[in-house]
Swiss-Prot record:
Keywords: Acetylation, Activator, Developmental protein, Differentiation, DNA-binding, Neurogenesis, Nucleus, Transcription, Transcription regulation. Transcription factor that plays a key role in neuronal differentiation: acts as a pioneer transcription factor, accessing closed chromatin to allow other factors to bind and activate neural pathways. Directly binds the E box motif (5'-CANNTG-3') on promoters and promotes transcription of neuronal genes. The combination of three transcription factors, ASCL1, POU3F2/BRN2 and MYT1L, is sufficient to reprogram fibroblasts and other somatic cells into induced neuronal (iN) cells in vitro. Developing CNS and PNS at embryonic and postnatal stages. Its main location: nucleus. Efficient DNA binding requires dimerization with another bHLH protein. Forms a heterodimer with TCF3. One of its GO terms (biological process) is carotid body glomus cell differentiation. One of its GO terms (molecular function) is chromatin binding. This is Achaete-scute homolog 1. PROSITE patterns: BHLH. It is found in: Nucleus. Pfam families: HLH. Residues 1-24, 39-95 are annotated as: Disordered. SUPFAM superfamilies: HLH, helix-loop-helix DNA-binding domain. It comes from Rattus norvegicus (Rat).
């Protein structure tokens, strides 16, 4: 019974497939090395072909004919000059050039100004010179101006304004005195009785002017003080 059972179980099992043959380790590494060498050779060949394709393109400008002693690759140089000119005209680079001092290198950058800028600068210099000369002349005519050489322009103008006001006040007083004296000169042409009546009036301006006509001093003490303009400043 047991043998029949084993036979039935053996008949019921399927046969197993044969296992594949595994090569040894040396054969595996040799195969991998051969594949890597083939890949490297293919990569080197493709790189060499690319270099051969790029070589004629690089040598074409060098083998081109020469005109006027310059190579035909002027397009590249002109483009480089344009880029350099654009960079040099930028305001940031111009400011850097102004800050740099090239005297230590033995040369200096040429500074060329347009004609309009040069004329404008010349006019400005002439204007400043005339203004300074005008203030110097005004400083000589104001009181204490000639002695004070360090008087500023504002102080010179202020002193000139005060000096003009003092002269105007003195001129007004002189005109008033002249008008009064003219009235006193015309008084003798009036009738004697009228002149006597006027002289008899005490404190009248006409009597004082007529009585002081012979002994009139052109400059009174008050007027002499007004002439001293240094007291006004």
């Amino acid at each position: 019974m047991e043998s029949s059972g084993k036979m039935e179980s053996g008949a019921g099992q399927q046969p197993q497939p044969p296992q594949p043959f595994l090569p040894p380790a040396a054969c595996f590494f040799a195969t991998a090395a051969a594949a890597a060498a083939a890949a490297a050779a293919a990569a080197a060949q493709s790189a060499q072909q690319q270099q051969q394709q790029q070589a004629p393109q690089q040598q074409a400008p060098q083998l081109s004919p020469v005109a006027d002693g310059q190579p035909s690759g002027g397009g590249h140089k002109s483009a480089a000059k344009q880029v350099k000119r654009q960079r040099s005209s930028s305001p940031e680079l111009m400011r850097c050039k102004r800050r740099l001092n090239f005297s230590g290198f033995g040369y200096s950058l040429p500074q060329q100004q347009p004609a309009a800028v040069a004329r404008r600068n010349e006019r400005e210099r002439n204007r400043v010179k005339l203004v300074n000369l005008g203030f110097a002349t005004l400083r000589e005519h104001v009181p204490n101006g000639a002695a004070n050489k360090k008087m500023s322009k504002v102080e010179t103008l202020r002193s000139a304004v005060e000096y003009i006001r003092a002269l105007q006040q003195l001129l007004d007083e002189h005109d008033a005195v002249s008008a009064a004296f003219q009235a006193g000169v015309l008084s003798p042409t009036i009738s004697p009785n009228y002149s006597n009546d006027l002289n008899s009036m005490a404190g009248s301006p006409v009597s004082s002017y007529s009585s002081d006509e012979g002994s009139y001093d052109p400059l009174s003490p008050e007027e002499q003080e007004l002439l001293d303009f240094t007291n006004w400043f």
